[in-house]
From Swiss-Prot:
Record InterPro entries: STK19-like
Cysteine disulfide partners in this protein: none
Cited PANTHER family: SERINE/THREONINE-PROTEIN KINASE 19, SERINE_THREONINE-PROTEIN KINASE 19
UniProt name for this protein: Winged helix repair factor 1
Role summary: DNA-binding protein which is required for efficient transcription-coupled nucleotide excision repair (TC-NER). Acts as part of a TC-NER complex which assembles and interacts with RNA polymerase II (RNAPII) when it stalls at DNA lesions.
Record-linked Pfam families: Stk19 (PF10494)
GO molecular function, one term: kinase activity
Effect on the protein upon substituting D217R: Impairs DNA repair
Keyword DNA damage in annotation: yes
High-level lineage: Eukaryota, Metazoa, Chordata, Craniata, Vertebrata
Length: 260
């Protein structure tokens, strides 16, 4: 793995055993956080994060995207998040999309939004017919995040040439020989901004005294230039990914750079 790819992989790593805040901190967290707690309304958390996505930054050419772990910053129980997404996948309402850098890191996109933007991006293109064929079959409604050769070629009758066109259209990426990940056309631009924004926000906190900052203070600061996705979007990222510890204080939640 070359150095550039390693840096990207490191940027997407999520600390698996860390919650956004511990259960003992629940009451203090909900009373002092500037953001809503969706413990009683899990579906609302999905809509909330979608609404944070800066459509204008991408000229409305991307569907609203967020990272799965960002939901962990809005609900106290990670199991609830996992069950919610599994249920929405089974219903064909959301798609989980592999980022390609860490097997445990997924982008979340509403199925209808992905369908709409994929059709729009291929309009007038030579690949429009095969894109529509892909969107009209039940692959998007499947809870699978990748597809094998038998499923693509035998069950859904896609030829090698059509699969190649879907890869070029950005709806598939090669997983390995004979299998493909579902993808979002143009998502590379989002990933670029996401990585730069995460690094910029963590750097800002590291420069603070004791490498910590009150959540309420951070949330009201003007976003530095590299936070193109927005301050709140990135705050939910670093909390949900366990890159900062949430420390309850009399003044509110303190975000401290995690050293573990």
């Amino acid at each position: 793995m070359d150095r550039k790819r390693k840096l990207i992989c490191d940027a997407f790593k999520v600390k698996k055993l860390r919650g956004s805040c511990s259960r003992d901190e629940t009451d203090l967290k909900t009373s002092t956080s500037p953001y809503p707690d969706f413990t009683e309304d899990p579906h609302g958390a999905v809509s909330y994060l979608c609404a944070l996505f800066p459509r204008k930054l991408f000229n409305d050419t991307l569907p609203p995207l967020f990272l799965k772990h960002q939901l962990y910053s809005l609900m106290q129980d990670r199991t609830v998040v996992d069950r919610l997404l599994s249920s929405l996948q089974q219903k064909g309402e959301v798609c989980l999309v592999q980022t390609g850098f860490d097997l445990d890191t997924f982008m979340v996109v509403m199925t209808d939004d992905l369908r709409r933007t994929a059709l729009s991006s291929s309009e007038g293109d030579s690949r429009a017919t095969v894109v529509r064929k892909f969107l009209d079959c039940d692959l998007l409604l499947s809870p699978n995040i990748s597809y094998g050769r038998d499923e693509m070629m035998m069950k859904h009758r896609f030829s090698d040439g059509e699969i190649t066109q879907l890869v070029r259209a950005g709806l598939l990426t090669v997983r390995d020989a004979g299998s493909w990940w579902l993808a979002v056309p143009g998502a590379g631009r989002f990933i670029t901004h996401f990585i730069k924004g995460r690094k910029a926000l963590l750097s800002q906190i590291r420069r603070s005294r004791y490498k910590e900052v009150l959540l309420t203070d951070l949330s009201t600061r003007k976003a530095p230039p590299n936070l193109r996705l927005g301050m709140e979007f990135h705050i939910h990222d670093i909390i949900g990914a366990g890159l900062v510890d949430c420390v309850p204080t009399a003044s509110g939640i303190l975000l401290r750079i995690s050293e573990t």
